[in-house]
Amino acid sequence: PWLWMHGLKDYQRDRLVLFLDPSKDPLGGGYHLLQSTVGIGSGGVLGTGLLQGQLTKLRFIPEQHTDFIFSALGEETGFVGCLLVVLGFAALMARLLQVARNARSDFESLVVIGIGTMLMFQVVVNIFMTIGLGPVTGIPLPFLSYGRSAMVVNFIALGLCLSVVRQSRRSLAQLR
């Protein structure tokens, strides 16, 4: 109670209230989250088809090219498309863990684990945000959201991981 009244500013309290119940302000701060969940739900199992989603085409889903790309994906490709994206990120993380295990040094291993953690944090926060399990943030979905700086950083990070793979293969070849 004390932290709520004195530790948080008004806009921070409003964000927490809207995270817990976005219907308190459906045309204001809760609009993004409500439209996002409606978009994902309207996709059903197989979706409406690429570029065929009504909420997406009519731009009811705000920021659908950046923060809410998963909502647009859910509407147009449905549960199956969302599941494939999540499985793709899980496969990427599994591969990064394998790369970390095979790295030449602890430093390289920790770099790869850090990059994997960074990417998975972004994925989890973005997906949780779009399905209503987390507060609305500005974190993009790696490799899918429009955002040049985030995309460049993510590709540089994967480039570092590929360098670790190359170095570990080179040292393995020298051992043979």
Residue positions per predicted region:
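Lipid-exposed faces of alpha-helical membrane segments in multi-pass integral membrane proteins
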Residues: 80-94, 113, 117, 121-124, ...
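Structural signal for the C-terminal ends of transmembrane alpha-helices
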Residues: 90-101, 161-169
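Membrane-proximal intracellular helices of multi-pass ion channels
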Residues: 83-86, 94-108, 113, 173-176
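Loop-to-helix entry and N-terminal half of a specific, functionally important transmembrane alpha helix
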Residues: 99-138, 144
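Transmembrane helix-bundle signature of multi-pass membrane transporters/permeases
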Residues: 60, 72-75, 115-119, 147-150
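A juxtamembrane structural motif centered on a specific transmembrane helix
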Residues: 124-176
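Hydrophobic alpha-helical segments of integral membrane proteins
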Residues: 5, 86, 118, 158-163, ...
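Hydrophobic, glycine- and aromatic-enriched re-entrant/interface helices and adjoining loop segments
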Residues: 1-84, 103-111
